């Protein structure tokens, strides 16, 4: 009988992997394993048995073959920056670190498309694109060290750019859990000239891609993808609207969005505004805490991009529209002198949660989508809940990226790892998530404990999902336990 991931089988796996990809690319030093055992989240750490670092598609295929043969679970990792336990391995599991696969393979400047490997970070893609007069779309809350490919795969439709939508990844190469290489969309047809064309009307592209969106490494390894880049404009300006009345937030956001002018748009509550628009000085956390009470309840921030004359017209149109509803277009945030400079820099090279975690040492996130109208209600409920359990409302940050249809919301609770807060926050997490679900929050990416919350309410959907998992990954070697809280299929 073969027992999943026993020490003997893992030893054999290490031996085979070392022969296939070189022993310097199979890491077993305890200090290095420890680094991969945890993330910024509240998820309990788990030490991997080894880290394998393949450098090519063929090497990944070999690793997958051995994992199947020896029933060793593997967890793909591209940037390693996700923060809800997505890359924490199961016992005796192996980390498949794809950072060595970090090449931009091709670019079509006229089409604004680049073909990238999973190890390409946002910073790298941004620098590469800028040399060709283009820019990469980066989500403001992520660190620039996140993998562009893995993030685009994971975010749609959680994150969206108000002007460009959420599907930035068009066609891709996937290594299925049995090692089969699959190309989606036009890439599947070598004779077709434009390998990146994504056609929703075709079952070969959109439909196929969706199976791997947000699959958290459970259905295969994405080894390449064509991603959209955008032009660099002559003029880029940042603007702000401050809002103190919850009832006006939806109206303001909608009016600005519906003009279809802003290219990047983010809404912050006062806590996240303080964290976002403050410089990372040694005093960062302390200064932030002092700032929060003096800031407006909400800050709506957006960029306008285009030719000088075009931007001028947009500015006057938006200013007029806002004036009509009693608001002003600002080019700075009162009390935050560097807001403009920081916003323009963050939309290209984001600092992400490592910066915000400096406020109280750590920060946990509840990501969901909801109607923009419901945001203030959910926010108030969360603040009350947090206060009832002895936390300050100054620890509750909210960042929203509005898209055409919904608000994409990240509720962030800052906490301190050194005092007894960790257990308390961990215990509250599920309860808060459940309460917010009742109020209209939808967890479109049910990570970790949220999987239980969501799938227990959608039995039929969950059964079909498990059927897909069983069909594609009969040995259950690909990042087990991510789609469910148990290892059973
Ligand atoms: C507004 C916002 C909110 C966010 N909220 C959260 C959040 O709440 N929790 C969170 O964890 N992240 C969150 N993210 C991060 C994001 O969704 C991705 O998890 C992250 O950007 C992935 O980048 P990474 O390179 O660090 O991936 P990694 O940390 O390396 O991996 C992320 C997940 O994808 C899988 N994976 C990685 N590479 C591949 C690959 N090549 N093929 C197949 N599977 C792969 C991994 O196994 C893992 O499950 C948020 C981002 C934004 C912008």
Report residues per predicted region:
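N-terminal flexible segment immediately upstream of the FAD-binding catalytic core
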Residues: 1-65, 82-112, 147-155, 275-278, ...
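Short amphipathic alpha-helices in soluble, non-transmembrane regions
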Residues: 13, 17, 67, 252-257, ...
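General beta-strand structural signal in soluble alpha/beta enzymes
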Residues: 26-30, 53-54, 74-78, 96-98, ...
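Conserved glycine-rich FAD pyrophosphate-binding loop
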Residues: 41-42, 46-47, 72, 79, ...
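Helix N-cap motif at beta-to-alpha junctions
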Residues: 57, 245-247, 304-311, 371-375, ...
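FAD-binding subdomain of flavoenzyme oxidoreductases
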Residues: 104-107, 116-256
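A conserved active-site cap/scaffold subdomain adjacent to cofactor or substrate pockets
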Residues: 236, 242, 291-329
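Short amphipathic alpha-helix segments
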Residues: 248-284, 375-391, 425-432
């Amino acid at each position: 009988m073969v027992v999943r991931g026993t020490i003997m089988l893992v030893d054999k796996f290490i031996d085979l992997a070392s022969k296939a990809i070189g022993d310097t690319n199979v890491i077993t030093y305890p200090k290095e394993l420890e680094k991969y055992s945890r993330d910024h989240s509240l998820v309990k750490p788990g030490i991997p048995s080894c880290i394998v670092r393949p450098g090519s598609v063929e090497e990944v295929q070999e690793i997958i073959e051995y994992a199947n043969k020896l029933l060793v679970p593997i967890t793909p990792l591209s940037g390693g920056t996700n923060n809800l336990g997505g890359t924490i391995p199961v016992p005796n599991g192996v980390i498949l670190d794809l950072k060595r696969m970090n090449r931009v393979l091709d670019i079509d400047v006229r089409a604004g498309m680049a073909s990238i490997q999973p190890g390409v970070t946002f910073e790298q893609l941004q620098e590469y694109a800028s040399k060709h007069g283009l820019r990469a779309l980066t989500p403001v809350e992520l660190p620039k060290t996140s993998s562009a490919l893995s993030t685009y795969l994971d975010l749609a439709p959680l994150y969206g750019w108000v002007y460009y939508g959420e599907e930035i990844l068009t066609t891709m190469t996937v290594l299925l859990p049995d090692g089969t290489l699959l190309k989606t969309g036009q890439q599947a047809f070598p004779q077709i000239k434009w390998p990146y064309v994504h056609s929703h009307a075709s079952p070969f592209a959109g439909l196929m891609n969706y199976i791997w969106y947000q699959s958290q490494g459970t259905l295969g390894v994405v080894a390449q993808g064509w991603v959209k880049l955008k032009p660099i404009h002559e003029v880029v300006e940042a603007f702000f609207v401050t809002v103190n009345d919850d009832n006006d937030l939806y109206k303001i956001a909608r009016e600005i969005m519906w003009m279809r002018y802003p290219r990047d748009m983010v809404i912050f509550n006062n806590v996240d505004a303080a964290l976002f628009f403050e410089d990372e000085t040694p005093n960062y956390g302390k200064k932030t805490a002092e700032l929060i009470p003096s800031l407006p309840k909400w800050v709506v921030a957006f960029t306008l991009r285009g030719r000088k004359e075009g931007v001028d017209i947009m500015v006057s149109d938006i200013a007029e529209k806002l004036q009509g509803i009693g608001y002003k277009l600002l080019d700075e945030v009162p009390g935050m002198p560097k807001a403009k400079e920081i916003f323009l820099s963050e939309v290209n090279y984001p600092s992400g949660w490592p910066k915000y975690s400096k406020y109280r040492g750590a920060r946990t996130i509840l990501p969901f989508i909801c109607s923009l109208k419901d945001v203030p209600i959910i926010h108030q409920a969360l603040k009350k809940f947090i206060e009832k359990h002895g936390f300050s409302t100054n620890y509750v940050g909210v960042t929203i990226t509005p898209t055409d249809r919904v608000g994409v919301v990240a509720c962030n609770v800052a906490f301190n790892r050194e005092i007894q807060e960790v257990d308390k926050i961990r215990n509250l997490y599920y309860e808060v998530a459940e309460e917010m679900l009742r109020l209209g929050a939808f967890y479109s990416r049910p990570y970790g404990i949220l999987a239980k919350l969501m799938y227990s309410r959608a039995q039929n959907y969950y059964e079909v999902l498990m059927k897909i998992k069983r069909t594609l990954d009969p040995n259950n070697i690909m990042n087990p336990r991510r789609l469910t809280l148990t290892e059973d299929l």
